Amino acid sequence: MSINIEQAIIHEISQDSQGQLRCRLRPQPLLNSQAVEMMLEELHQTYTSKSGKGFGYFGIHGDDGEANPAFSNALQEYRAGDLGFVEFTGQASKLLQEELAKYDFSQGGFLLMSCYTSMASDFLFVALLSAKSSMTVLDDMELSQNNHLDLSNIQLAARIDLTEWQADKDSRKYISFIRGRAGRKVADFFLDFMGCVEGVNTKAQNKTLMNAVEDFVASSELTKEERQQCRNKVFEYCSERFDEGADIEIKDLADELADQGMESFYDFARGGSYELDEEFPADKSTLRQLKKFSGTGGGVTISFDGGHLGQRVIYDPISDTLLIKGVPANLKDQLDRRLKGE
C-alpha cells in the first residue's frame, strides 16, 4: 500500500420524512479491514490523479470574510490529543449538516474522514460520497439491485496536509480540493464547512512557468531540437511531481535542466517579472502545452506534438492556415472513402 491508515470513519447525513437533514453518527472508527484498506487506497489514488485541483488554507474570520474556524479549531484539538477521533468527526458532521441545510439542492451523503500517512506526511482526507445503484447476478442466476459507494466519481473531497499545516502556518496551499465541473463553484458549501479559503492559483502559476520556459528557450542559443528537449524535460519533471502528489520546486527544476546542459534557468525565472513562487502544485493540463498544440472551434479539433511544428505542420499566421504534411493513415482512409462516395 502507498498509504498507512491511522483511523477512518463514515457518518451519514440524510433527509428525514419531513425533508430535514439529520446526522447518523457511527460510534466507533472503522476496523482496519482489507475492505477499508482497499477503499482508502483507491480513493487516495483517484484523488491524487485528479487534475485541476484547487489549493487553499484555513481562513481567519474577519481577515478572510466569514470563514468559519470551528472545523480547524476541532482539528487542532484532535491533533493535540484533547479530542478523540470519533468526537472530532462527529463535530465535523454536524458542521457539514448545518452548511448543507442552507442549500435546497442537497440530499446529503456519506461523510468519510480518514487520517493516514503517505510520503512521510500526515493527511486528513474528507469526502462526501454518494451511493450508486448497480445490478448483480445471484447464485440462482437471478438479477438483484444493490447500492454501493461511488468511489470512482468523487466530486466533493478535500485533503489536508497536516504536516505542512502545523510546520508552516503561513502556507496557503496545505488544503487541496476538487473543483466543480466547468468552473462552477458547486463545492462552495464543502469548503465553507471547513472554513477553507482558496490561496494559490495553481493554473496561473503553471501558466507563468510555461511562459518562463518559452522565454528561456527563445533567449538561448539552443537548436530547435534542444529547445523541444528542454520543454519535454520540464513537462517530464512536472508530471512526476504531479504523480507523486508533490510540489514543483523551481530550484529543483533548474537543477534538472542544468544536468541536461541548460544552465541558469533559476536565475532567469527568478530575475524576471514572472512572480513565480518557489514551490507550487503542478497542473498537468496546463503544462501539457509544452509538448502539444491543441485547439477546438467551429467543428474542428486539432492536436499535434510540438516537435512537428515547422516540419510536418506548417503555420502561416498571415493567411491563418495550417498545412499538414503526411496525413495520419486512419484520417486519410476516412477522407479517401468520403471522396470516393461523392
From Swiss-Prot:
Give start-end ranges for the coiled-coil region(s): none
Subcellular location per UniProt equals: Cytoplasm, Nucleoid
List the signal peptide residues. Answer: none
Q: Name one Pfam family in it.
A: NA37
Keyword match Cytoplasm: yes
GO CC, sorted alphabetically, is: bacterial nucleoid; cytoplasm
Q: Does the keyword GTP-binding apply?
A: no
State the Gene Ontology terms under molecular function: double-stranded DNA binding; single-stranded RNA binding
The domain of life is: Bacteria
Coarsely, its chief localization is: cytoplasm
Keyword terms, alphabetized? Cytoplasm
In the record, the note on similarity to other proteins reads: Belongs to the YejK family.
Supply the HAMAP family for this chain.
NdpA
Write the protein's name. Answer: Nucleoid-associated protein Shewana3_2426
